[in-house]
């Protein structure tokens, strides 16, 4: 299978869609696609049938284009190529299915692949709900206090003509800034966030940030497990459908969102392609996957049972993701609570100390 040709097609056919369908819609679409393929219904009829279903409303603009491409004589993989709803991994697997004459099996395997991916992402999202609510609630309460509560004490403190503690002066300055220049501060924050997003996407900043988050941050271990699960799952499905290791790696590399891993996988591909290292040696050198992952790769190469090992790795690390998520939350929640307690404590102390001084002065 020639990956280079598919990369060129993806670039040429690249287009904009107003929105991107969820992974859930994608695996449900593939599940029905697989059933209809097994029923020997022509592909163009399958696409036309599925695009009219309400549950695939988000996919309809994309499927309209796929239908048009098929009618214009393009192959199945070419018809899906270039659409943001169908990534490089998806179109590469479809091309493999066409070339091998096993499109029905590939589509079924893809439906299971995206279903497992969706399940993992959903678990991560569900685990983040409480920390997000905690953070948002804390920010809203802090802004409310700075805008409405603190100013009521300012007049009292100023009328007492007393020397305020440093913490109180800082608190009053922040409160005044929020009240007087709140809109300007908000605009600056939005510009900073937008600048960071652009820098992440367009410059080396994205690579170094992802490298730090994966190798140096307190949550690096959990992040490494999640990405290792993704790599193992992808290697499993590509090898199961007779794709070479090199072709599988380049597709995984092109589909990888983490910029640090994207570069590391590119280097691994080059080292294996040149014959400089074996698969296990290249991964072990880079240290981007856990040692257990690398050890199982070595066993796979020694025994020739790559398919079985990839499948076991996939199942193992999909399970490890749940423990990684629980570990992540067990660290994050206390950190958030402690941080909020420090902020609240700072505000309380900054208000109560001068309040006692005011009361004493009256006495």
Protein language model features and the residues they cover:
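Membrane-interfacial amphipathic helices
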Residues: 1-27, 31-34, 209-223, 291
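General membrane topology signal spanning transmembrane segments
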Residues: 1-5, 163-172, 247-251
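Glycine- and small-hydrophobic-enriched helix-loop-helix hairpins
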Residues: 23-123, 220, 224-328
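Membrane-interface starts of transmembrane alpha-helices
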Residues: 56, 87, 180-181, 185, ...
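Bilayer-spanning, highly hydrophobic alpha-helical transmembrane segments
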Residues: 119-170, 174-200, 319-363
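Membrane-cytosol interface motif
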Residues: 162-172, 210-227
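Alpha-helical membrane-embedding segments
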Residues: 184-204, 240-256
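Junction motif at the cytosolic side of a transmembrane helix
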Residues: 197-216, 275
